[in-house]
A protein has these predicted regions:
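AMP-binding/adenylate-forming catalytic core of the ANL superfamily
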Residues: 95-105, 112-114, 378-381, 385-386, ...
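Conserved AMP-binding/adenylate-forming core of the ANL superfamily
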Residues: 9, 26-71, 75-79, 96-101, ...
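Conserved pre-ATP/AMP-binding loop-to-beta segment of ANL
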Residues: 10, 26, 144-147, 151-153, ...
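Conserved AMP-binding/adenylation subdomain of ANL enzymes
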Residues: 206-226, 231-271, 282-286
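Structural core segment of the AMP-binding/adenylate-forming
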Residues: 55-56, 84-159, 291, 473-476
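Conserved ATP/PPi-binding loop(s) of AMP-dependent carboxylate-activating enzymes
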Residues: 351-355, 367-397, 435
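Conserved AMP-binding A3 loop
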Residues: 38-40, 176, 183-207
Length: 500
């Protein structure tokens, strides 16, 4: 039974877990396959692993990377790292060796916790290539979550090592964690060729997520289906803490597959849907859907056109919330209330969350536009304090009043409800994922047969936008097959253009 009624008082993630485990120790928190961890169970596992991290020398301010699919160990590692005052760097499981090498080096990673296999990827081989081809200095400590004969140490051995660490040592480490400390760093595509490291701090992560959960009217009885990758802000910042601050349970799907998603929602009686149209459409069109009981679904969040938002409603989430946000703003800045009429929820992201301010700006005059007029969306309040190791980008990203230049276009009505209108920047959103054309162009410009290349997005029924490349060749044009193979060697699959 849960006794959680009010907003948690904790201002750091470790303290939040302590608070919830004290209030509702027997309440389910993490469901991963056949395993269900209560808040009390989960806290105990986090603390034993946190002491293990202390035993191998992890300290406040260190940056520890996580590279794995959605599984309980991802969350245990996430909370254990923050418990000792270190910073989590969530790595994309689709990233190429080149991309991983950049992020591991840029963030100065000291330890990487990973699963040896993810779907069809051998991460032991991938990380070996990173070491051979790109070099890592200093070389991080590698901690596989599963047994690996080639590894001297595994993530699973941390509790045994931590048994030698006194509780007082962990208490001291946790006490030093501040509400303004960086909790995690997420990499997101930017308007240049290299991704941006976005640090997010403890208190805003908790406070913003609480407001997101309030707009959905979440309670401890809710169970959130999570197939969105935990390495996205939509997963490890938005969904996780919106649900956790309201005392509910997270039902993990290791990776998205529509048939399995339908089965999980039915079997686990999930009430909260978190997904994009690239997920809801294949779920709706799946042949198993008519035979699945999805009546437990109630609310959740999604993004997209009215037709795309309607897909979540058609799956059963009748109180779905349309949202607007970005990684730099802790996932969401605007969320429409689940109880608003559907016709409003289909088109509007609603008003800003508590702790957030918004302006719609004429980029030519830098003045506010009138209600109903379109301009650039600028945000203030719950935001990153700036990009990691990148003062030049920081100077460009924030205006003279400290508002974030989102590069997105929108309108505000008389009630302050935001409607998203498109992108000011050249960013392409394919399958719900932001991709920078400049990054792709920089890779393909190294192809021996390409003289010039321009990458853009074109309308796509399934992905919203699909990547397309316009190429000027130096001689005989390369085939589409050759271009796809070239791109897949250095880019994540979703960044490889589909049309040439």
């Amino acid at each position: 039974m849960s006794f959680l009624m009010n907003k948690p008082t904790s201002r750091t993630v470790p303290n939040l877990l302590d608070e919830l485990a004290y209030v509702q120790p027997e309440q389910p928190f993490v469901v991963d396959g056949e395993n269900c961890l209560t808040y009390g169970d989960f806290r105990n596992l986090v603390r034993t692993h946190a002491k293990g991290l202390l035993s191998i020398g992890v300290k406040r301010g260190d940056r520890i990377a996580i590279l794995m699919g959605n599984r309980a160990e991802w969350l245990i590692a996430y909370f254990a790292i923050m418990n000792v005052g270190a910073e989590v760097v969530a790595l994309n499981t689709m990233a190429s060796p080149r991309e991983l090498a950049y992020q591991l080096t840029h963030a100065e990673i000291t330890v990487i916790i990973f699963e040896p296999w993810f779907r069809d990827r051998d991460f032991l081989e991938v990380l070996g290539e990173v070491k051979r081809e790109y070099g890592l200095d200093p070389l991080p400590t590698f901690l596989p979550v599963d047994t690996d004969p080639a590894s001297a140490l595994t993530f699973g051995q941390l509790p045994e090592l931590g048994a030698l660490v006194k509780e007082d040592a962990l208490a001291v480490a946790q006490a030093k964690v501040s509400s303004e400390d960086t909790a995690c760093i997420l990499y997101t595509s930017g308007s240049t060729a290299l991704p941006k490291g976005v640090p997010l701090h403890h208190w805003a992560m908790i406070d913003n997520a609480w407001s997101i959960g309030e707009r959905q009217h979440l309670t401890p009885d809710d169970r959130l289906w999570l197939a969105v990758a935990l390495f996205w802000s939509y997963g490890c910042v938005n969904a996780l803490f919106a649900l956790m601050t309201h005392g509910g349970a997270i039902v993990l799907q290791h990776h998205f597959e529509p048939g399995e998603a339908l089965r999980l929602i039915e079997c686990e009686r999930c009430t909260v849907f978190y997904g994009t149209a690239a997920m809801s459409r294949p779920m709706y069109e799946h042949p198993d859907r008519p035979n699945r009981d999805l009546s437990s679904l109630r609310t959740g969040t999604t993004i997209g056109t009215p037709e795309q938002v309607q897909l979540a409603v058609d799956l059963g989430a009748s109180e779905i919330c349309n949202v607007y946000g970005l990684t730099e703003a802790f996932g969401n800045s605007c969320v429409i209330d689940a109880k608003m009429p559907l016709e409003r929820r289909l088109v509007s992201s609603g008003p800003v969350l508590d702790g957030v301010k918004i302006r719609i700006i004429d980029v030519d005059t830098e003045e506010n536009v009138a209600a109903g007029e379109m301009g650039e969306i600028r945000l203030h309040g719950h935001l990153t304090n700036g990009y990691l190791n990148d003062q030049e980008r920081n100077a460009e990203a924030f205006d003279s009043l400290g508002y974030l230049r989102t590069g997105d276009l929108g309108t505000l009505d008389e009630e302050g409800f935001l409607t998203y209108r498109g992108r000011l920047k050249e960013m392409v959103k394919t399958g719900g994922i932001n991709v920078a054309p400049a990054e792709i162009e920089a890779v393909y410009s190294r192809h021996e047969a390409i003289a010039e290349i321009y990458v853009t997005g074109i309308p796509d029924d399934r992905l919203d936008e699909a990547l397309a490349a316009v190429i000027v060749s130096k001689g005989e044009p390369p085939t589409k097959t050759a271009l796809v193979e070239f791109g897949r060697k250095v880019l994540a699959g979703y960044k490889v253009p589909r049309h040439y």
